[in-house]
C-alpha cells in the first residue's frame, strides 16, 4: 500500500522546517569561526587562520542556502524541535570538524614543528586530524562538553586551535539552540518553547522564551568574564614570571572551559601543567561557578542579594558533598600513597592534610563533582578504590540542575532521596494524616510529589541504563590490560577531560600516526596525562 499524498506532503513540510532551523544554526556557527580566525592572525598562525576562514565560509554558505531554500516552512512543533536538537548537534559537530581537517592538511611541516615546545620530541597533534574521524571526535567532544580529546599534546596545536577548542566547549555548555534563539530569530511562542525545551531545559527566567534565552547567555557571558578576570589576577599573583600574554590567554580559555564544565585546557597536563599547589587552589572556584544553577545567578542579580546562593538547596548539598567527598577520597589516597599511622590521631590528620593525598583529593573530587574534569593527578595510576569512589561518589550525581554540568544532577538525586524517605515516613502516619512533601522552599501535594519523584527517578534510571550499556561496549572493545574500573570510569557519561588509559598506548599512537588503527589512536586521545615525563 503506497503512502498517501498528504503523508508525503507532511514529511516534506516537516523536513523543510528542520532544514531551515539547522541551516540558521550553521550560519551562526560559521560566523563564530571568525573569532578563532582573529586569534590565529593575532599570533601569526596564518595557515590556521586560513583553515578557519575556509571552514567558516563553507559552514555559513551551506547553512544560508539551506535556510533560504526552506524559509517559508512552518514554525516548529515539539517533534520538529526534537529532531532539530538531535540533528543540529550532529551537523554542527560535522562542520566544526572542518577547521581541524583543513589545518592538518594545509599547514607545512615546518610550521607544525614551530607549534611544538622547544626541546620536545613529539609531533604536533594537528597531524592527528588528518584522520576525519579524529577531527569529528574532537569537535563532538567539544560541543557536547564531553572533554575527551585527540589533541594528545595540547600546546602543539597552536593558539588558534587552543582557543577554538575552548570556544566550542563554551558554546556547547549553555546550548547552541539557546544561543540561536537569543541571537538569530524570534519564533512564535509555542515554537520557541519547543526549540528551547528540545535541549532539555525547563527553567524560565523571563516571560518569553527568547527573553529567557538572552538572560541565560547574559549571565553566562558575565560569569565567564568575571572568572577570566579572577584567574588572570590570581595567576599573575601566584606565578608573576609566567608572562602577561600567556596569563591572559590561559585565564580566558580556562574561564570558558571551566564555566562550561568541559575541561579542555591550554596545558599539556591540564592544571597539573602549572606544577603549583597554589594554582590548583586558584582553579577550584572556576569549577564551582560552572556547577551552580544559572537561575540562582539570575535570582542573585535580579534581587541584588548574594544570599540567594546560600538559600539554594542544590548549592548547600553540593558543598556538603564537597566536604564529605574530599575527606573520603583523601582517605583512599592516603592509604594508597602510604601515609603512615603512628598511633597519634591528631598528628596523623595533620600529616594527611599536608600530604599529596589531600592535594589530589581536594582538587580531583571537586573536579569530578562539578564534572569539569581538570586534572592534577594521573588518575589512571590510582588504585581501583579511589577511582570507584569518584565515579560513584561524585561523577554520577554531578552538580546543579540548570547548570552546565553532567551527571544525574543534585536536584534529581535530592528528589529521589527525599521521595524514598517520604514514602517510608508515610507508612507510619495515621490514615487521614496530611502527607505533603516539602522539597527546598516548595511544598507538593501527594499527586504532585509522585509526579516529581517519578520524573526524577525515570531520568536517573535512563542515565544508569546508558552507563551500563556503555560499560558493556567498552568491555568488548578495550584491550585486555584494562580493568573493570577503567571501563566503568570511561563509560560513565563524560563532562570533562577524564581519562585513565596508559601512557604506553599514547606513545604507540603518537609515534605511528600514519600506521596505527583509528580505534587505537582514538583511545590515545582518552588518556590521562603521563605519570612520568
Where are these regions (language model features)?
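Membrane-proximal intracellular helices of multi-pass ion channels
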Residues: 1-533
